[in-house]
């Protein structure tokens, strides 16, 4: 092989590597943008089942993680049948992390996801309702109703006023009737959910969601 041919091959290999790197960087950038648009908090951008496998999943939540992964493997069927997840347990038990892992799988499959904490959801509705232009609020409520996977983080952390409870009832009822999945994380126990909200909210969540619980101390590590 002469020097010219060898150089051409080397240049081709080098360019191929560059293109591969560029494509991977674009894929990551696109994924980050999609996570942002879905409302995923920046702290959880790195959450994925792949990361759990690579870094190790704590034994205390392994069973819950396995169930979440099983759910994620059948996203299309779960979306069509309106099946969701309800993660409950004490703080720091990876409930939000696992919910985001599921969300990431859905986003990578180009399925609609919207993640929002309950306090933020209701604060947003209050703020928008004070605006004379109600179009913004209608668009927000349409997204809550119609997105394929709605993730309600910190369910039960919202202030329990009557209108708040009614709004929660309306959201759950609408998605239940239209067979839209809801994925919930909460520090409340199932019996506390039943006591906080009207009976039909609890019944609808229980009948359409895989209930996954975790008990014990927080798994979060203190900053060094």
Model-identified regions with their sequence ranges:
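N-terminal pre-Walker A segment at the start of P-loop NTPase domains
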Residues: 50-78
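Walker A/P-loop nucleotide-binding motif
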Residues: 77-99
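Interdomain "pre-motor" coupling segment immediately N-terminal to P-loop NTPase/helicase cores
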Residues: 1-42
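Loop/turn-to-beta-strand initiation segments
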Residues: 111-112, 146-150, 178-184
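Conserved catalytic network of the ASCE P-loop NTPase/AAA+ motor domain
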Residues: 77-79, 106-107, 142-145, 173-178, ...
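Short glycine-rich substrate-engagement loop in P-loop NTPases that contacts/grips substrate
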Residues: 61-68, 103-146, 159-162
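Conserved adenine-nucleotide phosphate-binding loops and their immediately adjacent elements
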Residues: 40-53
